[in-house]
């Protein structure tokens, strides 16, 4: 298993006793470890849990079944005949011949470079997930006056989180005429804290050379292009980008697995098997982008 897929317990209980998890992070659990807000586990466990609590339930189940795992282990390559090459500090280069491989590498966030926003490259521009990790796990505050671009759930949650940590979130701008986040998150993360949501708006300029000093947003038309004369300027030191996810599929492509050009993920059958027999793709490596 490449990555921290939470339901590995089900594979074990179905009769697969020889399982090895290869995780590049320092702990199991994946992105859940930095999601300290509640709302997890309602359907699975019948109670409301934080992300780390939710992950801990599955980690405990894996440990009870004595499922093997290697942390700080980076998978370098996967071949079509299911040969895995990985590396870590303790063992050096690791070669594994597997009978089956489950790919659960997740996603990475789309960066500022993919948006073509005019301006320099000053400090103070973060993806929402990076800011979440800095605040929730590393104990660092990215900034004090914030604009957030994108109204997906991570952007909404970080608007609330930054506010609770003492920052001033001036606005959440969304390119589309609707929010991509859950209605409850719009209410609990924006409305309850008086944070305005500007739909059909985007960032058109980032000011500042060493550090972000200002942001300009503008309304966009049906063609998603800025409308002249609708610009609004904000005096900020930080911008958080919540503008979509890109599947971590470098290993998938390297193995020669057939990819879906629309979702950027692997093409799979109903049992999640890819075009290579014995190689399965699960989790967020199937994320769909509009």
Which residue ranges define each predicted feature?
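Rossmann-like NAD(P)H-binding beta-loop-alpha module
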Residues: 9-16, 132-178
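Conserved N-terminal glycine-rich FAD pyrophosphate-binding loop of Rossmann-like flavoproteins
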Residues: 25-48, 183-184
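A Rossmann-like FAD-binding core segment of flavoenzymes
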Residues: 56-88, 96, 163-253, 258-260
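Residue-level detector of alpha-helix initiation sites
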Residues: 4-5, 27, 107-109, 152-154, ...
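FAD-site-proximal beta/loop scaffold in flavoenzymes
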Residues: 103, 125-134, 237-286
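Glycine-rich FAD pyrophosphate-binding loop
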Residues: 16-31, 174
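Short, small-residue-biased leader/transition segments that mark boundaries at the very start
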Residues: 1-8, 289-290
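FAD-binding core/adjacent interface of flavoenzyme oxidoreductases
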Residues: 56-145, 222-229, 240, 267-270
């Amino acid at each position: 298993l490449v990555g921290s897929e939470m339901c590995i317990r089900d594979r074990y209980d179905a009769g697969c006793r020889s399982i090895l998890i290869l995780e590049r992070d320092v702990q199991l659990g994946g992105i859940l470890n930095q999601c300290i807000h509640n709302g997890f586990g309602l359907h699975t466990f019948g109670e409301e849990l934080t992300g780390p609590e939710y992950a801990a339930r599955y980690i405990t189940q894996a440990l009870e079944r004595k499922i093997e795992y290697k942390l700080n282990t980076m998978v370098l390559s996967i071949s079509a005949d299911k040969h895995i090459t990985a590396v870590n500090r303790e063992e050096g280069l690791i070669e594994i011949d597997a009978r089956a491989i489950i790919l659960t590498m997740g996603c990475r966030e789309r960066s500022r470079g993919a948006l073509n926003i005019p301006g320099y490259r000053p400090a103070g521009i973060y993806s929402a997930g990076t800011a979440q990790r800095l605040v929730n796990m590393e104990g660092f505050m990215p900034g004090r006056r914030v604009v957030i671009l994108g109204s997906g759930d991570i952007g909404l949650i970080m608007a609330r989180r930054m506010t609770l940590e003492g920052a001033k979130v001036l606005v959440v701008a969304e390119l589309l005429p609707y929010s991509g986040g859950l209605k409850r998150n719009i209410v609990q993360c924006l409305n309850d804290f008086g944070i305005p949501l500007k739909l059909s708006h985007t960032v058109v300029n980032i000011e500042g050379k060493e550090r972000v000093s200002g942001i300009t947003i503008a309304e966009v038309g049906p063609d998603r292009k800025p409308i002249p004369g609708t610009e609004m300027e904000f005096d900020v030191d930080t911008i958080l980008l919540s503008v979509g996810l890109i599947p971590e599929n470098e290993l998938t492509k390297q193995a020669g697995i057939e990819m879906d050009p629309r979702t950027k993920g692997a093409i799979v059958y109903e049992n999640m098997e890819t075009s290579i027999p014995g190689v399965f793709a699960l989790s967020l490596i199937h994320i769909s982008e509009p």
